[in-house]
C-alpha cells in the first residue's frame, strides 16, 4: 500500500473510531481549488470488514485525486448516495465528475458498490439476478418487464435509436427487493439523460432467474 493510500485509509478508520455506534455511513471530504471530493466512510461492527470496505472506496478516491493532480484535469468532484442498507449489506452509488478545460461539458462516472458488511467483500450481481446477454435486457425494456430510469431516477422509456449493447455488472440495491443496473452517460441514451438505470423489481428478478436457471 503506497503512502498516500495508507494515509487515506488510516484517516478514514480513525475518523470512524470517533463516531457513535449507531452511525453506519459518514462523509469524508477533501478539497482544493477545483477539487471537491465527498465520499463514504462505512462503519460496521466487524473491524476487518470495515477496513476492507474503506480500502476499496479509497481506491476510487485516489483515482479522482490522480485525475486532478497528475492528469491535470481542470475540475474533479465526487459525491455519493447510500441507496440501501441493512444489517448485512450496504449499497452505495459513488459518482466522479471531471471536466477538461474547454470541453463542451463535463462527464460523470457512477459506480454501484454493494458490500457485505460482515466480510467486507463486494457482492456480485449474479448473487441476486442471472442475466445471459444484452438482448434479454433490451427485450425486457421494450416489453416493460424492466424499467428505464434517467439520471434523476425518473421512470421513462429507452430513447428511439438506442439499445442495450452489453450486460453491466455495475449495479445498486434500491430496497424492497429492487435492483438497478447502472449505465454511464451515452450508453443508454443522450447526455441529457445522464446516468441511466435498468430497473429490476422482485417480479422481474424471479422471471430472469427462472428463465436463466
Describe the residue ranges of each PLM region.
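Bacterial N-terminal signal peptides
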Residues: 11-18
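Compositionally biased intrinsically disordered regions enriched in Thr/Gly
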Residues: 21-213
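Bacterial N-terminal signal peptides that target proteins for export
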Residues: 1-8
Amino acid at each position: 500500500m503506497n503512502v498516500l493510500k495508507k494515509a487515506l485509509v488510516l484517516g478514514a478508520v480513525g475518523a470512524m473510531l470517533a463516531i457513535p455506534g449507531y452511525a453506519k455511513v459518514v462523509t469524508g471530504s477533501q478539497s482544493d481549488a477545483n477539487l471537491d471530493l465527498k465520499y463514504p466512510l462505512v462503519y460496521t461492527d466487524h473491524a476487518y470488514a470495515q477496513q476492507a470496505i474503506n480500502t476499496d472506496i479509497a481506491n476510487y478516491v485516489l483515482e479522482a485525486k490522480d485525475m486532478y493532480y497528475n492528469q491535470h484535469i481542470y475540475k474533479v468532484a465526487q459525491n455519493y448516495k447510500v441507496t440501501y442498507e441493512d444489517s448485512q449489506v450496504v449499497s452505495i452509488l459513488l459518482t466522479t465528475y471531471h471536466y477538461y478545460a474547454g470541453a463542451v461539458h463535463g462527464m460523470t462516472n457512477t459506480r454501484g458498490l454493494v458490500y457485505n458488511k460482515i466480510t467486507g467483500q463486494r457482492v456480485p450481481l449474479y448473487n441476486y439476478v442471472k442475466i445471459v446477454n444484452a438482448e434479454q435486457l433490451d427485450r425486457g425494456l421494450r416489453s416493460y418487464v424492466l424499467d428505464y430510469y434517467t439520471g434523476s431516477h425518473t421512470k421513462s422509456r429507452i430513447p428511439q435509436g438506442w439499445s442495450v449493447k452489453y450486460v453491466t455488472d455495475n449495479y445498486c440495491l434500491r430496497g424492497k427487493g429492487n435492483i438497478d443496473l447502472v449505465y454511464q452517460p451515452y450508453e443508454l441514451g443522450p447526455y441529457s439523460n445522464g446516468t441511466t438505470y435498468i430497473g429490476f423489481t422482485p417480479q422481474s428478478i424471479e422471471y430472469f432467474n427462472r428463465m436463466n436457471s
